[in-house]
């Protein structure tokens, strides 16, 4: 069963659906012969994987005669080679492959790794050409929060379905699958026609950028702002009368302005993200998001800050305040409610912040953090007006507190 929990257009949904389309499961480590026989089925056409980010990797110790190869791309190469031989290189027997691992351009990476195995195992040019011409490996982007097995709800679920299902999976309502593939692939695999949020697109790059910018970007700045205001859960931050407005400003007025996708599409995506942040079933602690905040800001928010400045001729106040909040969080100490502030990051970042805050001078703190090229890959003091803006926010947070500082930019 799949247990979907969350908000859908503002309504609370908690559904249970039986999955009845899986005919069997094979373990290639104990049933390798049956696993390889799959390649002999003429009607076989699609391969879909999610072996995590670490799964698409080349292991040079894998051998063709291993039963099976230890790596996923190794097993897939064995399967493809067996199919190639079974059907004597018939070009109509190629496979369409959709890797779902969260790696940018995962299809390209998987394809490269298969080529490495073809060369390592000397499988020949004929097979290489068949793989190139008869098979398609397509880049995808998946987006859905899947907490997995619902430990705390499983007794109630078993009571409801009246049998022992130990494979229940819990997930949020929102789902998106972007597939970088031509229209003929969409015709063969019309998942978008089944009422699912599946998009076939010429390039997944803008969607990858959209997710990183509009979902991960706001997470990174809202977390320290919320935490230093005494708010611990993402949902509570969204519903807070001041921080909620701050999150909205960062998403809709700042980050959205830096992306090159249709406005309506971005607006819809941002509204979906807010609904996900408001999920009554997921208590997402802001402290878990704040782990490694500096590298996260560098990849998720800094590109938006630069693009906004370039396009608007001024700095985005919300993103600047987010950076000041991160720097303040790394000062440590205690919150107004007495909770101890315990930042967590790479030792060199922790040591730098400790050293800078020990000076007691916000100018030195600002210049020191923005000038740390090992964090940013450049000196951010060179961005016009940034040093002054971050210092002003740091001063305001020290003097008036976080909430009053946030009110000042709304």
What role is predicted for each listed range?
Residues 1-410:
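Substrate/ligand-engaging "lid" and interaction regions
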């Amino acid at each position: 069963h799949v247990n979907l929990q969350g908000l859908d257009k503002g309504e609370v949904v908690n559904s249970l659906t039986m999955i009845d389309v899986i005919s069997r499961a094979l373990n290639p480590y104990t049933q390798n012969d049956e696993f390889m026989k799959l390649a002999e089925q003429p009607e076989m056409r699609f391969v879909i994987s999610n072996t995590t980010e670490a799964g698409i990797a080349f292991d040079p110790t894998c051998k063709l005669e291993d039963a099976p190869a230890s790596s996923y791309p190794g097993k897939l190469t064995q399967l493809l080679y067996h199919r190639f031989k079974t059907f004597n290189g018939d070009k109509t027997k190629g496979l369409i492959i959709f890797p779902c691992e969260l790696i940018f351009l995962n299809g390209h990476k998987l394809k490269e790794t298969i080529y490495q195995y073809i060369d390592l195992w000397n499988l020949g040019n004929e097979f290489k050409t068949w793989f190139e011409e008869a098979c398609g490996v397509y880049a995808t982007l998946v987006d859905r929060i899947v907490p997995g097995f619902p430990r705390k709800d499983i007794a109630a679920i078993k009571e409801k379905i009246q049998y022992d299902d130990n494979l229940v999976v819990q997930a949020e309502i929102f789902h998106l699958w972007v597939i970088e593939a031509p229209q003929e692939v969409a015709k063969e695999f019309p998942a978008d026609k089944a009422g699912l949020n599946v998009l076939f697109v010429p390039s997944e790059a803008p969607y990858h950028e959209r997710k990183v910018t509009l979902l991960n970007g706001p997470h990174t700045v809202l977390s320290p702002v919320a935490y230093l205001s005494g708010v611990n859960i993402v949902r509570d931050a969204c519903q807070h009368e001041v921080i909620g407005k701050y999150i909205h400003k960062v998403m809709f007025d700042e980050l959205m302005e830096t992306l090159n996708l249709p406005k309506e599409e971005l607006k819809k995506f941002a509204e979906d993200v807010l609904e996900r942040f408001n999920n009554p079933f997921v208590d997402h602690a802001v402290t878990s998001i704040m782990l490694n905040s500096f590298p996260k800001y560098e990849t998720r928010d800094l590109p938006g800050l630069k693009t906004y400045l370039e396009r608007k001729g001024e700095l985005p106040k919300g993103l600047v305040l987010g950076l000041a909040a991160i720097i303040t969080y790394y000062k440590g100490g205690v919150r107004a409610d007495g909770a101890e502030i315990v930042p967590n990051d790479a030792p060199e970042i922790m040591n730098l912040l400790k050293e800078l805050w020990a000076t007691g001078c916000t100018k030195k703190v600002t210049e020191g953090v923005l000038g740390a090229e090992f964090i940013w890959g450049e000196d951010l003091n060179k961005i016009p007006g940034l040093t002054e803006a971050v210092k002003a926010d740091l001063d305001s947070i020290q003097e008036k507190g976080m909430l009053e500082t946030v009110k000042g930019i709304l």
